[in-house]
Amino acid sequence: MQLPIVAPAPIVTKHAEAFRDLFENVRQYQHFVNYLTGLMVLTNKSLSNIARCVLDSADKTNLSRFFSQAPWVEAAVNERRICYLLEQTAPIRHSANESVLIIDDTLFEHVGSLFDHIAKHYNHGDGTYPIAHNPVTSHYVSGAVRFPLDLRLYRRYEEITQWETFVHEHFPDRTIPKQKKARAKFHKEVDPILLHDPKFQVLHDQFKTKIVLAIELLDQAITH
């Protein structure tokens, strides 16, 4: 059963005002509070389902355009969220020495592949390679106070560099090995040559390991 969203949830109304100045107009702010309400009250939390359940919008693409086109800044909203939570929880948080920062890389698996930056990632829990996104996340824990801080999307080297495409372009007569060890050996053979291609070099420079992403999250957490 779908639950229609006729008004923002009371808890959203109570706290969302702290973010009001980050949006250019009332309509953007309404999309923001409607989306938060959908995340809290609906079982199916997909963007399309939340849009269907919002009754005050005749155009069900409005919410999608809010995320793809409206000029609000995601990083600014998240920064405000962190500062707001730290302010609200100051009386009950433990000292820094008694608090921890958790870094996690749990996969977010998908059934289909019609998503940006999706790939087969290694699941070190069961040894499989499901189709998934692989976010690296940071989570703050201080006694009873626990909330997420931020995330970075890990993208496999072959995906972010379009490696197979460049291999086929530069080595049209070579077959790319599928076995892990043979593929790693093939990388060592062809990658130095691919790096002479300026287009490949640009993509190569965008790659970040999970450790690098985790350090970025740690540095961000320290600033707070």
Model-derived features with residue positions:
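Conserved, well-structured functional cores that handle cations and Mg-NTP chemistry
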Residues: 1-224
